[in-house]
Amino acid sequence: MIIWLTSYPKSGNTWLRALLSTYFFLKEEEFNFNILDEIPNFIQSRYFSPLVELSKLKTNPLEITNYWNAAQSRINLSGQTKFFKTHNACVSYKDKWFTTKENTSGYIYIVRDPRAIVCSQAVHSNIKIEK
């Protein structure tokens, strides 16, 4: 089953991934940023490539909604609890829900003051807040 780490971009998702990855997966004494790979971004192509030709998704990105749940079902075949990062909301698009109770064990919603998000995004994008 999947536990989702979900947030608006620049809200602390990477920070929480670092904490959870260290707690659950660190086998050495020293932190290494590669451990963040233990909580991958769900939208990575490796989860969708067995289901659809990826070039089809590049020409029509919203087509991915047709494969959200099939990809999650494949992930859950292992029977293990897995964490995934996403910026997707638990919503439907053209009657296709992002996830289902059969695929999801829980959510961790990360919330940050929107004013801080704007500042963080501005620094990240190297633009002035005034713009």
What is the meaning of each model-derived region?
Residues 1-131:
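PAPS-dependent sulfotransferase catalytic domain
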